[in-house]
From Swiss-Prot:
This is UPF0358 protein LCA_1078. InterPro entries: UPF0358, UPF0358_sf. Gene3D superfamilies: SO2669-like. It comes from the Bacteria. Belongs to the UPF0358 family.
Length: 98
């Protein structure tokens, strides 16, 4: 069975988004968000790179504009949720220490 190039492109981008999320999760676990402003730079860099990758896939018609927007929005949402969860956990830990 032959898989369409569009499907391969979409699956590749989904996989890359999952890798970015996993990378950021590891970095969040290793860094204290409230004491490490560099984490926002890391997030911005990863999202910028992924956005450029998605833009390229759209230009060569591996994915539609709608699919590209959905991929970027999903990754941004997951990263924001992860960041918020870790930040809240760290804030609660700070309260309990004081």
């Amino acid at each position: 069975m032959m898989i369409k190039q569009e499907t391969i492109g979409y699956m590749t981008l989904k996989s890359d988004a999952a890798k970015i999320e996993a990378l950021l999760t590891k970095q969040f676990d290793a860094l204290c968000l409230s004491q490490c402003p560099i984490i926002e730079e890391i997030i911005d860099t990863q999202l910028f790179g992924f956005t450029k990758e998605v833009d390229f896939a759209k230009r060569v018609r591996l994915i539609s504009d709608q699919e590209g927007s959905q991929l970027v929005n999903e990754l941004e949402t997951r990263i924001n949720q992860l960041y918020l969860e870790i930040y809240q956990t760290q804030a609660q830990n700070e309260v309990h220490r004081n």
